[in-house]
C-alpha cells in the first residue's frame, strides 16, 4: 500500500499539459497533490466501509473550484456546471436504479465524488472519468461474479472506480481516453 501511495504522489508531478482541465501549466503538478490527497483516503474509506464521507467530497469540490478559478471565469463556469450536472445525473441514476431494482444501486457519496470530479476536471473530463469508472466497475463486477466472490445484488464500492477515472483523466486529459475508446472500437 505504501508503494502504491508513493507512486500516486509521484504521478501527480507527471501530469500532461492536457490533463489539468484548463489550469495554468505552472499549477498542474502542484494541483495534483491535493487531488490525490483527497482521492486516496476516499478510496480507502469506501473499500473498508462502503461510505464516502461528505466533508471530504465537499472540501474536494470547493478546492477544485478554487483552483479552476485560477484558469479564469470560462474554466470555472465549465467546472461548476460539470460538478452540478455530475451530481444531478448520478443522483438521478441512483433513484432510477433503486426504483427498478427495489434496492439502492449507488450511494449518494458516489454522486458527491462525481461532483468533486466535475469541479476538478470540467465537463469533458468528468464524462471521460465516469466512462472509465463504469467500464472498470463493470469489468470488476463481472469478474467477481464469475469467480463467485460477488453474490447477485451484493454491494461493492464504486467510489474507487470513480476516483481511478478522475485520476487517470487528470494525468492525461480526456481527449486521450476518448481516442483510446475509438481505437478500441476500430473507429
Positions of PLM-derived features:
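Hydrophobic residues in alpha-helical membrane-spanning segments
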Residues: 42, 54, 158-161, 175
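N-terminal transmembrane signal-anchor/hairpin module of polytopic inner-membrane proteins
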Residues: 1-23, 176-177, 181-187
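Hydrophobic alpha-helical transmembrane segments and immediately flanking/interface helices
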Residues: 17-32, 146-158
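Alpha-helical membrane-inserting segments
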Residues: 8-12, 16, 67, 71, ...
Amino acid at each position: 500500500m505504501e508503494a502504491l501511495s508513493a507512486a500516486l504522489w509521484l504521478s501527480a508531478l507527471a501530469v500532461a499539459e492536457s490533463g489539468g482541465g484548463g489550469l495554468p501549466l505552472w499549477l498542474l503538478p502542484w494541483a495534483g497533490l491535493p487531488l490525490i490527497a483527497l482521492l486516496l483516503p476516499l478510496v480507502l474509506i469506501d473499500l473498508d466501509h462502503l461510505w464516502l464521507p461528505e466533508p471530504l467530497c465537499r472540501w474536494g469540490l470547493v478546492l477544485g473550484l478554487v483552483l479552476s478559478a485560477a484558469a479564469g471565469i470560462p474554466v470555472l463556469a465549465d467546472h461548476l456546471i460539470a460538478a452540478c450536472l455530475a451530481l444531478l445525473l448520478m443522483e438521478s441514476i441512483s433513484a432510477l436504479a433503486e426504483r427498478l431494482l427495489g434496492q439502492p444501486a449507488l450511494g449518494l457519496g458516489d454522486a458527491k465524488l462525481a461532483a468533486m470530479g466535475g469541479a476538478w476536471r470540467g465537463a469533458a473530463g468528468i464524462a471521460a472519468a465516469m466512462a472509465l469508472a463504469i467500464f472498470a466497475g463493470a469489468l470488476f463486477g463481472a469478474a467477481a461474479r464469475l469467480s463467485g466472490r460477488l453474490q447477485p445484488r451484493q454491494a461493492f464500492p464504486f467510489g474507487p472506480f470513480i476516483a481511478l477515472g478522475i485520476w487517470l483523466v487528470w494525468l492525461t486529459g480526456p481527449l486521450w481516453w476518448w481516442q483510446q475508446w475509438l481505437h478500441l472500437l476500430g473507429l
